[in-house]
Amino acid sequence: MKIGVLSDSHVSSFDQLHEKILLALADVDLIIHAGDFVAKDVLDGLKQLGELKAVRGNMDSDELKEILPEKELLEIEGRKIGIIHGWGSPHGIDDRVGNVFSGVDIIIYGHSHYSQNETKNSVLFFNPGQARNSFGILTIGAEVSGEIIEL
């Protein structure tokens, strides 16, 4: 399964997302957004592209905070995936989000605006970075691989 991952889009409308992101998301099986859409129009636009799983971020509108969960747990191709926005300083954020989930194979998060694609203690920590600068593609099958795509 091919998953498009983004976070921290920080735009007020869907049409402000980078064209390269939109082209890539047209070719995935699932879209995951790790929060800080800012505007509901971005959420609605992503839903038009395909199946979307999303969590809320600290900068999201009150409307989004009411309809999106703080965290999400999925199982895809036998792999458990935790999704959360994150909080606090970029330093140590992977440890903080790592403490939220147990028994997962992948943790997808955002907030720091710094991308990460690193395995620690058998868990892939995947942060696509701020969507104005980068996004990610996760491929899940017999193996799991992540790629950060710079804009």
List the predicted regions and their residue ranges.
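Generic secondary-structure boundary signal with a strong preference for alpha-helix termini
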Residues: 19-20, 47, 69, 90, ...
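Active-site regions of enzymes building and remodeling cell-envelope glycoconjugates
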Residues: 50-53, 68-72, 122-126
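Mid-chain, well-packed structural core segment of small domains
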Residues: 74-107
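Active-site environment of divalent metal-dependent phosphoester hydrolases
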Residues: 11-14, 37-42, 59-65, 88-93, ...
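N-terminal active-site segment of His-dependent metallophosphoesterases
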Residues: 1-50, 60-69, 78, 151
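Active-site neighborhood of phospho(di)ester-bond hydrolases with catalytic His/Asp-centered motifs
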Residues: 5-7, 30-36, 53-58, 83-85, ...
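Short secondary-structure boundary/capping segments
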Residues: 22, 44, 71-73, 98-99, ...
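Binuclear metal-dependent phosphoesterase catalytic core
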Residues: 6, 76-77, 99-103, 120-121, ...
